């Protein structure tokens, strides 16, 4: 089903019949782009759908930036940012879920048509797949960055989560392309995915993972076989078919190496990869809230939402004596905010949050030097109660202090730091809205707080 047919289908649905309002909205989008749909529309828009337990945001952003670098008209919908000339949403603003209803899908279609986009890069989460929102989207390329059955265990069982992710690759048109990142799951599930459809398939992984999990390296399209991670970024070597490429980026954290290889594999599959253009693209790429790094006065400030993976990467730098102390600013999501989905109010969810909090503090006890406990979408729970619970799990094994105001916590962590230290601001990534009671919220973005503090300090 082509994109125009999908638009017509959605417009005909009962809940989306207010066509006059949509027409006005569409005309506004076209006016914002300075064109009319008839003059600007492309007959065929290439759609790239990217799902996975992690990494999908980074892969989507790299692909989008590369396409723009080539002069292509690309629209990006990711949880870190939406980049669409026809939208009213500010670039670099976080988006909780890229699309959550048929109405959202229709708006995206109208935007890409108004802009005359050649490419749509769309981050896809499991909720959208489960709701059937992806069923009729004519994806040209479908990507699985990785898979961890426990990634969303407060919402799905391992079996349910696996079935949902696998379903994204079933019933595809033969002309479509499939790209699978092989990292956190077993060889048997990879074999299931390879049999899920009749499309052409590409796999990317690392030499280490392929060896440990017993996968034939000849069957892997893109193989990461060398990686050096330093405070200056990542350097790596990748085998792609019969060629070897050297890649270099200022992007940090070991886990991003496979994200970079994943984006490369998608572009290679599409026949668009050029090593020189790609290296230029990734050299200084920054993705909001994902390994966002500030290097000032010998300190390194990291904003990221992936606690375990970032701590692992920082520990490696510490073992090599590239960094000194690791300071972490962290909070924990509460429950009960009025507009959250019902599942965030259940007894099971509350129990799962306590389990997650304990796990996070266990990691901190092993790997960090100072912890600043603060607010992070506490909802109905009191910030102090959450922080006291977290402090209890730390068992005085690591220095910690409670600073309820998040901005003040970030400020103190930076001011307390010494040359060679790392300040890791965890949990919220690029999000701005912080739900601080059952009925209220405030606006705070970690990167803006960091930049404000650095400016005040003259750093």
Can you name each region flagged by the protein language model?
Residues 50, 123, 145, 161, ...:
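Residue-level signal for inorganic ion chemistry
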């Amino acid at each position: 089903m082509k994109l125009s047919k999908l638009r017509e289908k959605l417009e005909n649905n009962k809940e989306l019949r207010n066509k006059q309002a949509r027409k006005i909205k569409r005309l506004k989008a076209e006016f914002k782009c300075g064109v009319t749909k008839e003059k600007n529309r492309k007959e065929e828009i290439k759609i790239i759908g990217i799902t996975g337990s992690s990494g999908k945001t980074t892969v989507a952003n790299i692909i989008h930036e590369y396409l723009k670098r080539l002069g292509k008209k690309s629209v990006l919908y990711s949880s870190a940012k939406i980049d669409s000339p026809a939208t009213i949403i500010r670039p670099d603003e976080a988006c909780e879920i890229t699309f959550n209803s048929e109405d959202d899908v229709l708006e995206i279609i109208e935007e890409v048509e108004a802009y005359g986009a050649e490419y749509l890069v769309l981050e896809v989460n499991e909720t959208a797949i489960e709701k059937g929102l992806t069923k009729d989207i004519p994806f040209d390329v479908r990507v699985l960055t990785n898979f961890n059955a426990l990634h969303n265990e407060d919402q799905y069982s391992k079996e349910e989560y696996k079935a949902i992710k696998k379903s994204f690759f079933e019933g595809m048109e033969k002309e479509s392309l499939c790209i699978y990142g092989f990292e956190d799951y077993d060889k048997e599930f990879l074999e299931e995915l390879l049999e899920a459809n009749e499309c052409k398939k590409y796999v990317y992984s690392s030499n280490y993972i392929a060896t440990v999990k017993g996968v034939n390296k000849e069957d892997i399209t893109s193989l990461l076989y060398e990686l050096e991670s330093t405070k200056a970024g990542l350097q790596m070597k990748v085998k792609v078919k019969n060629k070897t490429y050297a890649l270099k980026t200022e992007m940090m954290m070991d886990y991003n190496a496979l994200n970079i290889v994943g984006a490369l594999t998608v572009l290679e599959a599409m026949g668009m990869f050029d090593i020189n253009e790609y290296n230029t693209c990734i050299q200084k790429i920054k993705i909001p809230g994902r390994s966002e790094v500030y290097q000032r006065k010998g300190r390194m400030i990291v904003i990221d939402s992936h606690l375990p993976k970032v701590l692992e990467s920082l520990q490696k730098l510490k073992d090599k004596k590239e960094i000194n102390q690791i300071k972490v600013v962290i909070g924990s999501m509460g429950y009960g905010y009025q507009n959250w989905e019902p599942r965030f109010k259940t007894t099971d969810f509350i129990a799962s949050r306590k389990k997650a909090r304990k796990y996070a503090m266990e990691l901190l006890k092993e790997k960090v030097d100072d912890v600043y406990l603060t607010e992070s979408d506490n909802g109905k729970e009191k910030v102090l109660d959450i922080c006291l619970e977290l402090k209890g799990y730390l068992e005085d094994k690591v220095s910690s202090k409670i600073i309820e105001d998040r901005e003040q916590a970030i400020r103190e962590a930076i001011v307390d730091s010494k040359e060679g230290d790392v300040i890791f601001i965890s949990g919220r990534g690029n999000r701005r809205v912080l739900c601080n009671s059952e009925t209220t919220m405030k606006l705070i973005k970690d990167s803006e707080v960091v930049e404000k503090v650095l400016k005040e300090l003259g750093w």
